[in-house]
Structure formats: C-alpha cells, structure tokens
Amino acid sequence: MKKIFLIISIFIFSVTSFSENVIRKKDLKKVDKIYYLKNSNVPFTGKISEGKDRFYYLDGKQDGKWIEFYKNGNIKSIINWKNGRLDGKYIIYENNGMKSTEATYKEGKENGEYFLYYSNGSYRTKGAYSMGKPIGVWEYYYENGKLTGKGQGI
C-alpha cells in the first residue's frame, strides 16, 4: 500500500512539475515590433492563453491562427498571422455571433474578397483587393439588402 501511495505521489509531482506555464499578454513587452517576455532579451516563441483566447508568437512576432472570444462565449475574431503580418483569413464577429468583417490578407495587405456586414447578417459592402489596392466593382447595400450603389476599384 505504501508503494502504491509513493508511486502515485511521484506521478502527481512529476505531472505538475512539467505542466505548461500560463503566459498572458501582460507578461510580454514590445520593442521595435518584437515581443519579449518581461525581464528577457530573447524574442518570445509560444502560446498566450487568456481565458479561451489563444495567441501565438514565433521569434517575437505574431504567428498562426489567433482566436479571441467575447465574455458570452461567442467568437470575437479569427485572425491569421505570419511573421508578424496579417496573412490569410481575417474575420471579425459581432457580440451576437454574426460576422461584421471578412477579408483575406497576404503579407500584411488586403488581398482577395472583402466583405462588411450589418449586424443582421446582410451585406454592407462587397469588394476585392489586390495587395492592398481596391480592384473591380464594389457594391454597397442598405441594411434591408437593397443595393445602394456601385463603385469601381483601381
């Protein structure tokens, strides 16, 4: 019986000793667009956890898929980063769970379809970008879904 207790105690101690440290945004400092743990001169690589929110850094720069939540549990944003710049899908949600903005980025610039939504889910704006420049036909809508106007990108 003592051996079992000893084995269980050692196991519990080893699991808690090697558990992941929780790091929060407030534990980081930003110097010249690079993030470091406070009291460190090494660029931070790792995951930041704040509640359900998840943020990732690689060599001191934002990296990977960041997911942020409202207090009610709904998703607030899904943002993709690469080497400290927006890269990939960029989606912002209203507190009610409806999308408010949807875009795609490449190397920190809008690149691809771009949508703005009203809180009821209907389109506010539809357009497209090519490396940060608006292109093609842009459409603008009333909240009831009726087209209010069109414009031309570059």
PLM regions with names:
Residues 4-13:
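Sec-dependent N-terminal signal peptides
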